[in-house]
Structures are given as structure tokens and as C-alpha cells.
């Protein structure tokens, strides 16, 4: 079954870590985490460095995402940030190290792994942006399944202005916004406003700063109302078929629909609809046959 293969992929990436996540008040922590009601919140917490995606920050984010990710009680992740900058991208000090240093390669590799992990994860990931997202920070927004922002937020890939073209951010951004908009961002480094980002598909929604958190949580809670394995399978198949030809995509999606029907929760949802009642999800990937 497609869903089980997806689960095995995550296990290989270390999902079986069984650490309990608690809110940390330590100002030295690069990220803060909390989980309640099926929603895990991961907060970038290095405003002094503009929440730069340093190697340490990338590793912290990866750990926060993977920890207990196979827990059926986890339904959705929200990534946000402390301060006026969501993330300024890579820490340029790490990229200006001495010749022969392996650090830049490790940074780029870790960043790419994180972006792919977000898309391979069995639960949706929501970016909640209230400020500036540039370079790899913009890449992080583009890599999330849903992205919402405040009206004051801006998005840019200004690497070209400092002599380092945003080639890896271009992978996520070029798959999210139209090609010519992506190239304009990459070639000029000029930012998009929140409304422009919404218009071109980088964002799912824009809210006032005052409403941003409540509206984001409302989206997350709506996700939590659905069966986790059904959502997981749907996310996996959506991402898979997007890179396929039309015929292959229909074949993949058709097989997924059959897999979905075999899920215990798939049958429960149909029965609940026919019986005019709310479904009682098992939130497990158990199959009925």
C-alpha cells in the first residue's frame, strides 16, 4: 500500500525518536516547540541573527519536525518565528569560511534535506509569516504545504545582490510561483509584497497582523478534524502526481483512491456520511482488507 511505503521512508529518516516535546523558555534555544490538540508549533527563536538558517538552526528544525512524527495524535505542524524577520536565509558567515572548508556543502545539503523532509512528512506543514522572508527563508515558505502571512510581510530572493544566486531556493520557488515571476525574483532580488505573493501562489492567504495567529490556528484545527492517514495519503499522492504526465498522474491517483478505500478510516467516513453522523476516526493506517 502506498501509505505504508511512505511510513517506511519516514522511519528511515529517524522518525522513531520518542522524545516528549515541551515549551522551552531558554533564550539560547534556536527554536521553541509546543504541541496541543494535534497541532505542533515550531518557532524560530533567534531574532538577533534574523532567524538565519544556520547549520545549527537547520538541524534544530529537523529534530523538531521528526521527533515523534509517527504519533497518530500529531495532525499538523505550524512554523513561525519570533521578531520582525521570519528568516533571512543562510548565515553568510558560515558561507565565507576558509577555502577547503566543508561547512558550506553541509549547510546546503542540510537545507535541501529539510525542505524535502517537509514535503515528505506525513502531516501538513503550515508556514505562518509575520515579517520578512528572504533567500532560504523564502524557500522554507515555498516548501510548506500551506503558507499564510500578515499584510506587512515581504518575500525575496536577493542572493544575486551579494554575489550568491539563490539556486537552491529556486527549486522550491520555481515549483510554487509562475516561471517568469520566479525568474524576476531571482534576477532582481526585489521583494514581493504579501498581496503579490498571494496573487502569484506563494501564499495561501493573507490576514491582518492581529488576525494572523487565530486564522492560522483555525486552518490547523480544520486539518485536525480529518483522519490523519487519509490526509497523509492525500498529501503524498498530490506531491507525487504533480511531477508526472497526465496519464501517469491519473494512474497514480486512481491507485491511491483504492488504497484510501481500504483504510479503516476511509470506510468509517463513508458510513458516517450515509448514517448522517460525525465520523469517529481511528487515526491509524489499519486496513479493512
Swiss-Prot record:
Pfam families: ECH_1. It comes from the Eukaryota. InterPro entries: ClpP/crotonase-like_dom_sf, Enoyl-CoA_hydra/iso, Enoyl-CoA_hydra_C, Mitochondrial_ECH-domain. Its main location: mitochondrion. GO terms for molecular function: hydro-lyase activity. It is found in: Mitochondrion. CDD domains: crotonase-like. GO terms for biological process: fatty acid metabolic process. Keywords: Fatty acid metabolism, Lipid metabolism, Mitochondrion, Transit peptide. Residues 1-14 form a transit peptide. One of its GO terms (cellular component) is mitochondrion. NCBIfam families: PRK08139.1. Belongs to the enoyl-CoA hydratase/isomerase family. May play a role in fatty acid biosynthesis and insulin sensitivity. PANTHER family: ENOYL-COA HYDRATASE DOMAIN-CONTAINING PROTEIN 3, MITOCHONDRIAL, PTHR43602. This is Enoyl-CoA hydratase domain-containing protein 3, mitochondrial. It comes from Danio rerio (Zebrafish). The lineage of its organism: Eukaryota, Metazoa, Chordata, Craniata, Vertebrata. The gene is echdc3.
Amino acid at each position: 500500500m502506498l501509505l505504508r511505503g511512505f511510513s517506511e521512508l519516514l522511519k528511515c529518516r529517524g522518525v522513531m525518536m520518542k522524545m516528549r516535546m515541551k515549551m522551552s523558555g531558554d533564550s539560547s534555544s534556536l527554536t521553541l516547540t509546543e504541541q496541543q490538540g494535534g497541532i505542533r508549533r515550531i518557532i524560530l527563536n533567534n531574532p538577533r541573527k534574523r532567524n538565519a538558517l544556520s547549520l545549527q538552526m537547520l538541524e534544530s528544525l529537523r529534530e523538531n519536525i521528526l521527533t515523534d512524527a509517527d504519533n497518530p495524535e500529531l495532525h499538523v505542524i505550524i512554523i513561525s518565528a519570533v521578531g520582525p524577520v521570519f528568516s533571512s536565509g543562510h548565515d553568510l558567515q558560515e558561507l565565507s569560511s576558509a577555502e577547503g572548508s566543508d561547512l558550506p556543502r553541509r549547510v546546503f545539503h542540510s537545507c535541501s534535506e529539510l525542505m524535502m523532509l517537509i514535503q515528505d512528512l506525513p502531516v501538513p506543514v503550515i508556514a505562518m509569516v509575520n515579517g520578512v522572508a528572504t533567500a532560504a527563508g523564502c524557500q522554507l515558505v515555498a516548501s510548506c504545504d500551506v503558507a499564510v502571512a500578515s499584510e506587512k510581510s515581504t518575500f525575496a530572493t536577493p542572493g544575486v545582490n551579494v554575489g550568491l544566486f539563490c539556486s537552491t531556493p529556486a527549486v522550491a520557488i520555481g515549483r510554487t510561483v509562475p516561471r517568469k515571476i520566479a525568474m524576476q525574483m531571482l534576477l532582481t532580488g526585489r521583494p514581493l509584497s504579501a498581496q503579490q505573493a498571494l496573487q502569484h501562489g506563494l501564499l495561501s492567504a493573507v490576514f491582518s497582523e492581529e488576525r494572523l495567529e487565530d486564522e492560522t490556528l483555525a486552518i490547523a484545527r480544520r486539518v485536525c478534524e480529518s483522519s490523519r492517514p487519509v490526509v497523509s495519503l492525500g498529501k503524498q499522492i498530490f506531491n507525487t502526481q504533480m511531477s508526472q504526465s497526465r496519464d501517469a498522474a491519473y494512474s497514480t491517483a486512481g491507485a491511491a483512491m483504492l488504497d484510501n478505500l481500504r483504510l479503516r478510516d476511509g470506510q468509517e467516513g463513508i458510513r458516517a456520511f450515509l448514517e448522517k453522523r460525525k465520523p469517529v476516526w481511528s487515526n491509524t493506517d489499519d486496513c479493512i482488507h
